[in-house]
Amino acid sequence: MADFKLVVSDPKTGKAYNVDVTGPRVNKFIGKPIGSEIDGETAGLPGYKLIITGGSDKDGIPMRGDIPGQVRRRVLVSGGIGYHPTENGMRRRKLLRGDEISAEIVQVNATVAAYGEKPLDELAPKKEKKEGAAGGRAPAKK
């Protein structure tokens, strides 16, 4: 069964929160296209409504809203999601994924459309990093 990370962006505060989606809750996301609204309860955020804005698969290939289905395609693009040209008029063939969430997707991006009673800070707490003696770095070689 596929597990993925849901990155929830809060437009009011400008912060993003990572939520792990595992088990049977994943099935409620599979088949949903970019732009669809989902209930936050499926991600452990009761009272919230989320809008899917994109994602990427296991190889880092981004989802693009104008490619239908769950497929990977080599598309000639001149800008937008997946390609940012350095000069005007440049086009390039890029590998992109369709707009539907499939089992190969490992990250789904979403924004908050409607807020619940509890703030996101409480529902998706920040994970603290463990720091060693050198501040998380390897000791210096002599």
Curated annotation (Swiss-Prot):
Keyword Ribosomal protein in annotation: yes
GO biological process, one term: translation
Top-level taxonomic group: Archaea
Signal peptide interval: none
SMART domains, per the entry: Ribosomal_S6e (SM01405)
Similarity comment: Belongs to the eukaryotic ribosomal protein eS6 family.
Pfam families (alphabetical): Ribosomal_S6e (PF01092)
UniProt-recorded Gene Ontology molecular function terms: structural constituent of ribosome
InterPro entries assigned to the protein according to its UniProt record, in alphabetical order: Ribosomal_eS6, Ribosomal_eS6_arc, Ribosomal_eS6_CS
Source organism of the structure: Methanocella arvoryzae (strain DSM 22066 / NBRC 105507 / MRE50)
Annotated Basic and acidic residues bias: 118-132
Name used for this protein in its record: Small ribosomal subunit protein eS6
Keywords of the record: Ribonucleoprotein, Ribosomal protein
Region (Disordered): 117-142
Gene name as annotated: rps6e
PANTHER family: 40S RIBOSOMAL PROTEIN S6
GO cellular component, as recorded: ribonucleoprotein complex; ribosome
